[in-house]
């Protein structure tokens, strides 16, 4: 989790999904914004202070977007393997990956 200085939305937490090995060679990476609006939907992952976040929030994998690595200004925390498993499940729900072909 990083503080990201979004050009439009201002400073907010983002989860960086791009693998560590690719970061040195990319200008844009995949990020997921955190929001204080929690809707309890399958594409969300709730986070709180026990995860190292300053406030309770949720990652909404429906809002996955490319972000500029240069605007990731400060590391907040590293999510646990359990939370990252939840992120993978929410990402699969957001993209319908793993759903039977129709």
Model regions and ranges:
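Alpha-helix initiation and capping sites
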Residues: 8-11, 81
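C-terminal terminal-subdomain/extension
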Residues: 51-102
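Short coil-to-beta transition motif at edge beta-strands of beta-rich domains
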Residues: 1-5
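Compact nucleic-acid interaction/catalytic patches
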Residues: 10-49
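Anionic group-transfer/hydrolysis microenvironments
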Residues: 7, 20, 64
């Amino acid at each position: 989790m990083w503080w990201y200085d979004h050009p439009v939305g201002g400073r907010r937490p983002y989860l960086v999904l791009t693998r560590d090995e690719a970061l040195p060679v990319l200008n844009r990476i995949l990020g997921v914004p955190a929001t204080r609006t929690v809707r309890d939907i399958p594409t969300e992952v709730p986070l709180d202070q026990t995860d190292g976040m300053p406030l309770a929030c949720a990652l909404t994998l429906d809002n996955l977007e490319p972000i500029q690595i240069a605007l990731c200004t400060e590391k907040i925390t590293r999510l646990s393997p359990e939370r990252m498993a939840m992120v993978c499940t929410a990402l699969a729900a957001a993209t319908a990956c793993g759903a039977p072909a129709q």
